[in-house]
């Protein structure tokens, strides 16, 4: 008998401890769900566009579904080591609370294990089975009616810091099918790959044949009520795991088969030329009139587009195109935020209309960056929240080797939903070939900035932070976090890093607050803080700090904040072509030829022609003329191999070059 036991252990690979614990799994109570038909979907207004079209679904087979979500005790009979995650972030501590911090692979493995153990066929519910079981014959917002009774409510609001609540299962009244906790408690993994609904009547749909995201349903604690609706759709990157998602299971002899082809690519990924562009350096001064790159999609295109379009990134492509991305949302802290894109195709003068670029359904997507590494690869990095807000983001990365026509599946490069992960446009490649990604260190205006470094082309990333709290940001002090948010980072000739940023302003020797400058000589482990010579910027403004192809450093920033800077301190002095000085206001460029020690060249970003423009986002309308440039905006820039500088604000695209910035100005003898 002992030999038989050893043979079983050897063949299955199951340890004795796992075998013993498997015999002690608490009962998973199952409820009979009859076959039937229902109408799936919802009104599809605004961010809920993916709930359309409403369509008839026939569930042709009866099945059993677990009355509640799987608990810690039940899951840990399969994975005892998961017990180490109990109570993380103050949630799901007890045996009878819903298990969380489980990936899609984790829950599929549990179903396979339980199937082997009991000789039955367990799996996840399809999205259609889940909604059918949740509705239980109802068509209200919730199976309880138009609203949620108090028994279901567990801090149902957007929560920057998750409020500890009980996730004990079975505490809500059962619906008409006998299921508890279908609204809230924790989100629940479903079997399907996510994708748009089809309009036709369907039998036993099981989603797309492939996609980047797996469906979740039901909503959770610490999120607004609307995400708990019967018809609300969500999804996650399969490898993601966090405190707001668990699962329940189905027992059925029926095996769903996904038959719907993947979604066609969006417009920004269609008809992309794959011929390498022949770049010719432009030596004459160039300044092109600003034009909008955020253009509303055609009404029948199926692309989402919301009222607030902001926080862009931009890169050049090897085929000569420019690719710009930004977030679109009605609420900056909302779960409906999407990342849109537009392409300025080589040889054309007008940007394409906006189309969807990246969206993990019902997750806040704050923070995007793009980089052409000049080695044939485009990098896209993005933040992804567990739900709403932008404090607890994980970081993901995608790559393209064909000018953005196709992208790799999102790779999670910083898996914890935590601070220091809010991606900022301005990814750089160092002389060592390392990638450096700046990120905000927290959600506030004075939380400083972090960097993440990859030494292997994006496979692995590390934040060199030592875990210490923010230091006092003052001249000469040191710390392990960059002073200011929305930082731009460059590598200096000696290999050190320099950063300029917004907020955490530093007093200079004259007692004036200046834009903070941070310098690190150990690749971001330690930063020394200085007051730069530039005025600080404020809300609705983001700078660009980069090294130009020609060698100098370029800063693009604002002379002041049009509403928050005291009137007497607004504007900066600029030289004109006749050698006289004038006071200008708004967006400017400054150039340094000595690694940031001095900035002898400064120019207001206007050609002097009067224009009435719409800057979008927080900028809105403004007047550009000889002494006024764009007053606010989140800036991002790239420089293509022809040495043209491509700058975007929250809505407008500018194109100019170093020759235009320096035209008519005194250039130091030691310039590049």
Where is each model-derived feature located?
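Bacterial N-terminal signal peptides that target proteins for export
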Residues: 1-9
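Asp-box/BNR beta-propeller blade signature and adjacent active/binding-site loops
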Residues: 258-672
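Disulfide-stabilized, aromatic/cysteine-rich ligand-recognition loop
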Residues: 24, 167, 173-175, 208-267
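Functional-site microenvironments in short loops/helix caps that host divalent-cation chemistry
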Residues: 33, 39, 43-47, 85, ...
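Residues that flank catalytic or metal-binding motifs in active/ligand-binding sites
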Residues: 26-29, 34, 53-55, 59-61, ...
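A short glycine-rich, aromatic-capped structural motif
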Residues: 24-86, 105, 184
């Amino acid at each position: 008998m002992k030999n038989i036991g050893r043979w079983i252990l050897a063949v299955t690979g199951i340890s004795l401890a796992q075998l013993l614990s498997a015999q002690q799994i608490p009962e998973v109570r199952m409820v009979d769900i009859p076959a039937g038909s229902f109408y799936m979907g919802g009104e599809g207004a605004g961010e809920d566009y993916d709930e359309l079209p409403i369509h008839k679904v026939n569930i042709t087979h009866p099945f059993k579904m677990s009355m509640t979500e799987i608990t810690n005790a039940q899951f840990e009979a399969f994975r005892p080591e998961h017990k180490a995650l109990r109570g993380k972030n103050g949630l799901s501590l007890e045996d009878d609370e819903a298990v969380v911090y489980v990936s899609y692979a984790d829950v599929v493995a549990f179903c396979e294990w339980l199937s082997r153990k009991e000789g039955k066929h367990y799996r996840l519910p399809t999205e259609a089975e889940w909604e059918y079981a949740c509705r239980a014959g109802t068509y209200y917002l919730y199976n309880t009616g138009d609203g949620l009774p108090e028994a279901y409510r567990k801090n149902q609001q957007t929560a920057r810091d998750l409020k500890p609540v009980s996730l004990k299962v079975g505490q809500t009244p059962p619906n008409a099918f006998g299921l508890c906790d279908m609204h809230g408690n924790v989100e629940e993994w479903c079997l399907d790959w996510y994708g748009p609904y089809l309009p036709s009547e369907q039998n036993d749909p099981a989603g797309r044949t492939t996609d980047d995201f797996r469906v979740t349903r039901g909503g959770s604690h610490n999120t607004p009520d609307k995400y708990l609706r019967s018809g609300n759709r969500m999804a996650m990157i399969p490898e993601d795991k966090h405190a707001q998602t668990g699962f329940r299971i189905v027992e059925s002899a029926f095996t769903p088969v996904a038959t719907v082809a993947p979604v066609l690519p969006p417009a920004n990924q269609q008809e992309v030329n794959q011929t390498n562009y022949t770049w010719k350096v432009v030596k004459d001064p160039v300044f092109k009139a600003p034009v909008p790159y955020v253009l509303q999609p055609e009404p029948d295109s199926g692309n989402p587009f919301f009222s607030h379009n902001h926080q862009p990134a931009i890169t050049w492509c090897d085929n000569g195109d420019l690719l710009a991305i930004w977030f679109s949302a009605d609420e900056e802290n909302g779960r409906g935020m999407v990342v849109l894109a537009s392409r300025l195709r080589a040889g054309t003068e007008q940007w394409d209309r906006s189309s969807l670029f990246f969206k993990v359904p019902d997750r806040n997507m704050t923070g995007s960056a793009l980089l052409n590494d000049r080695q044939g690869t485009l990098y896209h990095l993005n933040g992804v929240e567990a739900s709403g807000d932008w404090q607890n983001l994980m970081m993901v990365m995608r790559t393209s080797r064909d000018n953005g026509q196709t992208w790799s599946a999102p790779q999670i490069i910083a898996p914890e939903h935590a601070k220091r992960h809010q991606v900022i446009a301005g990814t750089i490649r160092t002389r060592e070939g390392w990638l450096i990604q700046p990120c905000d260190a927290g959600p506030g205006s004075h939380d400083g900035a972090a960097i993440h470094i990859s030494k292997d082309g994006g496979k692995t990333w590390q934040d060199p932070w030592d875990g210490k709290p923010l230091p006092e940001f003052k001249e000469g002090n040191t710390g392990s976090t960059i002073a200011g948010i929305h930082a731009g980072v460059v590598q200096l000739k000696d290999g050190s890093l320099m950063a300029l940023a917004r907020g955490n302003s530093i007093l200079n020797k004259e007692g004036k607050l200046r834009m903070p400058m941070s310098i690190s000589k150990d690749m971001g482990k330690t930063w020394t803080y200085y007051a730069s010579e530039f005025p600080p910027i404020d809300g609705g403004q983001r700078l660009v700090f980069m090294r130009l192809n020609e060698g100098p450093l370029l800063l693009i920033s604002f002379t002041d904040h049009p509403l928050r800077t005291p009137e007497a301190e607004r504007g900066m002095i600029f030289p004109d072509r006749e050698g006289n000085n004038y006071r200008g206001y708004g967006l400017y460029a400054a150039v340094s030829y000595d690694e940031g020690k001095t900035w002898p060249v400064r120019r207001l970003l206007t050609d002097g022609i009067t224009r009435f423009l719409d800057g979008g986002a927080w900028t809105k309308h403004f007047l550009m003329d000889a002494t006024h440039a764009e007053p606010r905006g989140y800036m991002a820039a790239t420089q293509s191999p022809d040495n043209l500088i491509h700058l975007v604000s929250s809505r407008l695209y500018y194109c100019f070059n170093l020759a235009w910035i320096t035209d008519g100005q005194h250039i130091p003898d030691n310039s590049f």
